Every structure is written in structure tokens, then in C-alpha cells.
């Protein structure tokens, strides 16, 4: 039997095992994609009957590598996820084979949404807004969002208005978008005016993160992060909007301080922190904590201008790319390379602000762009050093009404 036939036979058996023993539930398409990845395994009896149970490790690794290389786009990439769900040995091999998005430009497992995007190329996504239930859905889609092409569901966010702020709860499962869900991965919180936002991650990015309880002054130092710690609120970014001097037709002025990413990450040879494991904890079994980095900059104290305290601490700061005036259209324009088709004050492109001195070529690269393509449909393209989760939260901040800025 040829190697190609071997792989095809393996895929067929994986599909049979998947239908009988477990549900991958990493759906593709809007009608079926409102699901969350479940790290389930095949019943032992079902797998023992398979001829793949006794396959030599070297041959198994070779077969899995062939599958990973050939199934590089969704929905066929679900076969890679299926392989990881067979048993612990298969999972470990697949985890070694599947590279992070920074190197592979692929989103495979849920943890990929918390890892920096690829270098030098944008991951093309789009956001669908449901006005009736104040929910936002993030999809991975290489084609125009306005086409009939269904995208791969990634994240969901639900808006909750409070007396003094607004929260956007973010989940891996759009059917259960709440703080108490075990698929909760973070949130975005705005101030009363909707001009300043804080992005919270449910788990720390930096192993040296310090934890503080909101109703107590006790400080708990964590020398290393345990995968068993409860989900909390770790600030990883702060977003501020300023007065729009270009008027209502120009893009909003915004600045993003990335607490978890050093400014050197965008320089040649620079690196950004990368999470390796998602924590799925039921918040009902833990006390309510609120977590803060010891050196994080609070949203209320964010200064304006590029020479802020954030840059003095060596944090990455993202700022608006300056638009140009279009004489024919009589409006301010940005080059979205065809990814944005409808003029909107929400449209923006973000680049890295230089730490000191003049801007280098790395500060001209668009790290995140967001824009409107139809009613309640928006494109979101991002790249290294930010993750899909961070990009999604920044884009969510653009949906809020900002009377004080316009």
C-alpha cells in the first residue's frame, strides 16, 4: 500500500472514530460554527480495535506530519485536531508538529488565538455584529467577508452595560458567553465615557505576574504560573481615544499600550511572550479575584502622546497610521488594499510607535487594521506581535460610542 493510500485510510478511520467516539466541535461555517473546541478523547475500546494503536512511533510521526502539512486550511484542518484527540501519545506528537502561528501562519488549536500572529503577513479575519443581542463573532476567513464563503468561527464577545462602565465578555463558545463559563478567556472594560479601555486576560502572559485581590491589600507573589490557577483578570493592554482633530469624517485618534509585549518585539530579532496552554477553570469553584500586573499602567492615568510612561518602561505602543486627504472624494483615506469598502469613523490601521528617535521601517508595518465592508460586517487583519484575542479586543473598543472624542 502506498504512503498516500496509508494516509487516506488513516483519515477515513479517524473520521469513523470521530463520529462514533467523540465530537471535534471545532465547527466550520456560520450555521455550524457556534461551538467550542473540546479536548476529548476516544473511548479505549474503540481505539484498541484500530490498527493504528500499535503503529511504531517513528511511522506515526511521519504520517501525522504528512497530514499536518497537507491539511493547512479549514475545514480540512479539523483532521489535525482529530488526530490530537485520539489519545495522549497522539496529542503529544501533534503538539510537537504543529508550530505556533508566528512560524506557521496557521490557527489550529484554541491556544493559537492567544499566541502572536505571523511575521510579515496579515491573518485575515472578519467580525459579524448582532445588534439584537449585542454579540460580536470573530471568524477566520481568507475571502471577502461579504461573500457567501463561510468562515471558521474563532471567538465571541457579548456586551454588558453597567452603571459606570461597559464590559465585553469574550469566550471560545458563543452559546455560553459569561464570566462563569469554562470557555471564558478574557474581557474588555471601558470607562463611563467610552474613551479608555482595559483588556483583561483570564490567565497571565508573564510567568512573573503578581496577583492582587481587589478587596484586600494582600499581595500574592507567584514565582511561576500553574495551569491549575483560577481564571482571573490580568491586564494585558490599555486603549485610549483622543479628540478627533480631523472632524467626524476622519479616523479616530487612538493609542494602545500593550502591557505584555515589549517595544523591542517589532525590532529585528525581537520576541513577544507566547502562551503555551489555555486554562479552563470553572469560576464558580473559586473566589472572585481581580488580578493586576505590578507595573501595569492604569487606563485612567494613560498620558497622551508617543513619549508616554509606557514607552519609558519599554512597552509596545500602537498608534494610528496617519491618513491622507483624497481630493476627489473629499475625505481622509487609508490604503486597506481592498479589505475595507465602506467609509466609517470606526476604520483604522495601527502601527508601532517608535521608542526613541526617528521611526524605522518596522514602524511602517500595519500590525492591525479594521474596517467596514457591509452592514454589521467588518474585516480584522492582524500580524505579529499581537494575538487574535488582543486584536479582537482592540477592534471591539471601536464599536463603543465616543461622544467626547468626536
Swiss-Prot record:
Subcellular location: Cell membrane; Plastid; Nucleus, Nucleoplasm; Cytoplasm
Induction entry: Down-regulated by H(2)O(2) treatment.
Gene3D superfamilies registered for this protein in UniProt: Tubby Protein, Chain A
UniProt tissue specificity: Ubiquitous at low levels. Not detected in mature siliques.
Keyword Plastid listed: yes
Transmembrane segments: none
Family: Belongs to the TUB family.
Purpose of the protein: Involved in abiotic stress signaling. Tethered to plasma membrane (PM) and probably bound to phosphatidylinositol 4,5-bisphosphate. Abiotic stresses (drought, salt, H(2)O(2)) trigger phospholipase C mediated PM dislogement and plastidial and nucleocytosolic relocation of TULP3.
Name of the protein described by the UniProt record: Tubby-like F-box protein 3
UniProt source species: Arabidopsis thaliana (Mouse-ear cress)
Gene: TULP3
Amino acid at each position: 500500500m502506498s504512503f498516500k493510500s496509508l494516509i487516506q485510510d488513516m483519515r477515513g478511520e479517524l473520521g469513523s472514530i470521530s463520529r462514533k467516539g467523540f465530537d471535534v466541535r471545532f465547527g466550520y461555517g456560520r450555521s455550524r460554527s457556534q461551538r467550542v473546541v473540546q479536548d476529548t478523547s476516544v473511548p479505549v475500546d474503540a481505539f484498541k480495535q484500530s490498527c493504528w494503536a500499535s503503529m511504531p512511533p517513528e511511522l506515526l510521526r511521519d504520517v501525522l506530519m504528512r497530514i499536518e502539512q497537507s491539511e493547512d486550511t479549514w475545514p480540512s484542518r479539523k483532521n489535525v485536531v482529530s488526530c490530537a484527540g485520539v489519545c495522549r501519545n497522539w496529542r503529544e506528537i501533534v503538539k510537537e508538529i504543529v508550530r505556533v502561528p508566528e512560524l506557521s501562519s496557521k490557527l489550529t488549536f484554541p491556544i493559537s488565538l492567544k499566541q502572536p500572529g505571523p511575521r510579515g503577513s496579515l491573518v485575515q479575519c472578519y467580525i459579524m455584529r448582532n445588534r439584537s443581542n449585542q454579540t460580536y463573532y470573530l471568524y477566520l476567513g481568507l475571502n471577502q467577508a461579504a461573500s457567501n464563503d463561510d468562515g471558521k468561527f474563532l471567538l465571541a464577545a457579548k456586551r454588558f452595560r453597567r452603571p459606570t462602565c461597559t464590559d465585553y465578555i469574550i469566550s471560545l463558545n458563543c452559546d455560553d458567553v459569561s464570566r462563569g463559563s469554562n470557555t471564558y478567556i478574557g474581557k474588555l472594560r471601558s470607562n463611563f465615557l467610552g474613551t479608555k479601555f482595559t483588556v483583561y486576560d483570564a490567565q497571565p502572559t508573564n510567568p512573573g505576574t503578581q496577583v492582587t485581590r481587589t478587596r484586600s491589600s494582600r499581595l500574592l507573589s507567584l514565582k511561576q504560573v500553574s495551569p491549575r490557577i483560577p481564571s482571573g483578570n490580568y491586564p494585558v493592554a490599555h486603549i485610549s481615544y483622543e479628540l478627533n482633530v480631523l472632524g467626524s469624517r476622519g479616523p479616530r485618534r487612538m493609542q494602545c499600550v500593550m502591557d505584555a509585549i515589549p517595544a523591542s518585539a517589532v525590532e529585528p530579532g525581537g520576541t513577544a511572550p507566547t502562551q503555551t496552554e489555555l486554562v479552563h477553570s470553572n469560576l464558580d469553584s473559586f473566589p472572585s479575584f481581580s488580578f493586576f500586573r505590578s507595573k501595569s499602567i492604569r487606563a485612567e492615568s494613560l498620558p497622551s502622546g508617543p513619549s508616554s510612561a509606557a514607552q519609558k518602561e519599554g512597552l509596545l505602543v500602537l498608534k494610528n497610521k496617519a491618513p491622507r486627504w483624497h481630493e476627489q472624494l473629499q475625505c481622509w483615506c487609508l490604503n486597506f488594499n481592498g479589505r475595507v469598502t465602506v467609509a466609517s469613523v470606526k476604520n483604522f490601521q495601527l502601527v508601532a510607535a517608535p521608542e526613541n528617535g526617528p521611526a524605522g521601517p518596522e514602524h511602517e508595518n500595519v500590525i492591525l487594521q479594521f474596517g467596514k465592508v457591509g452592514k454589521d460586517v467588518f474585516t480584522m487583519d492582524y500580524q505579529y506581535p499581537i494575538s487574535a484575542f488582543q486584536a479582537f479586543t482592540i477592534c471591539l473598543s471601536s464599536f463603543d460610542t465616543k461622544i467626547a472624542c468626536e
